[in-house]
Amino acid sequence: MKAIGIDIGTTSICGVVIDIKTGELIKSVTKDSNAFISGVADFEKIQSVEKIITIATEILDSLITDDIAVIGVTGQMHGIVYVDKDGNAVSPLYTWQDGRGNQPFGDTTYAEFLGSSTGYGNVTDFYNRQNGLVPKDAEYFCTIHDYFVALLCGFKKPQIHITDAASFGLFDLKSKRFIGENNIDFVDGYKIAGEYKNI
């Protein structure tokens, strides 16, 4: 039996096939995502969700064989994508490199006001809320890899692992919830999210 691993990075997307018993690397595929898109300001570091998902799906599908038992997905932390109630991305991916949190906010910056760092999901969301930039049909935000898993499994609402939630900032690990607004479902530990092509 074999396992597939997908890593959605900032500049590239990688897929591997590993033998579950031996740990042997059977196959590896890496593609540049070339997903950065122009924003309105120089500090914006945003990417095309559609392009990322297309490449990640192509890599995944190219690795599937009859003896694949499980698929694991990971990716860049901190960055966020807004999703509507039907599970569709309604924004670009705001990457961890996005600099909106360093913009002035009163006598400080957006990031410093939250005691956080620019590029963290909570800072990006705070800036967007304060500046009317959250898409009107956005219901949730999540990482790009949580969004990819939701698409693969046919979920309308992404599930976020608490380690990714913690990487956004302003997440209480004890109560497993955000401090403030966010209507997100969290998962703890290692769990099967769902199925893709009967895997």
What are these regions, as identified by a protein language model?
Residues 8-10, 111-199:
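Gly/Ser/Thr-rich active-site cleft segment
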Residues 1-2, 107-109:
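Short, Lys/Arg-enriched, disordered terminal segments
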Residues 98:
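Carbohydrate-associated surface elements
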Residues 41-45, 109-115:
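Short glycine/proline- and acidic residue-enriched helix-loop micro-motifs
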Residues 94:
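Surface "functional belts" at beta-alpha junctions
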Residues 1-91, 137:
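N-terminal glycine/serine-rich phosphate-binding loop of ATP-dependent small-molecule kinases
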Residues 38-40, 103-107, 170, 198-199:
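Short, charged, surface-exposed secondary-structure boundary motifs
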